[in-house]
Amino acid sequence: MSERNQRKVYQGRVVSDKMDKTITVVVETYKKDPIYGKRVKYSKKFKAHDENNQAKIGDIVKIMETRPLSATKRFRLVEVVEEAVII
């Protein structure tokens, strides 16, 4: 039996938790400009499955690629790395 492919794991910040069992995570990373070689920061939003609704806005979370769970969800919550500070 063959092994499963290596799945992508990203760490990002929760920007929305308004949907039931779904969070929106923004992942910030750097790309190198092809002409000038300067590192440019860019971000991308992913929707992730949160089975127990445990992540809140501002939390730092780890998400992992999985099978398509809906039209837009392709990731699931692995763990909450750091909880947001509520003032």
Swiss-Prot record:
GO terms for cellular component: cytosolic small ribosomal subunit. InterPro entries: NA-bd_OB-fold, Ribosomal_uS17, Ribosomal_uS17_bact/chlr, Ribosomal_uS17_CS. Disulfide bonds: none annotated. The keyword Ribosomal protein applies. The keyword 4Fe-4S does not apply. PROSITE patterns: RIBOSOMAL_S17. It holds the Pfam family Ribosomal_S17. One of its GO terms (biological process) is translation. It comes from the Bacteria. GO terms for molecular function: rRNA binding; structural constituent of ribosome. Keywords: Ribonucleoprotein, Ribosomal protein, RNA-binding, rRNA-binding. Part of the 30S ribosomal subunit. One of the primary rRNA binding proteins, it binds specifically to the 5'-end of 16S ribosomal RNA. Belongs to the universal ribosomal protein uS17 family. HAMAP family: Ribosomal_uS17_B. This is Small ribosomal subunit protein uS17. It comes from Bacillus velezensis (strain DSM 23117 / BGSC 10A6 / LMG 26770 / FZB42). The lineage of its organism: Bacteria, Bacillati, Bacillota, Bacilli, Bacillales.
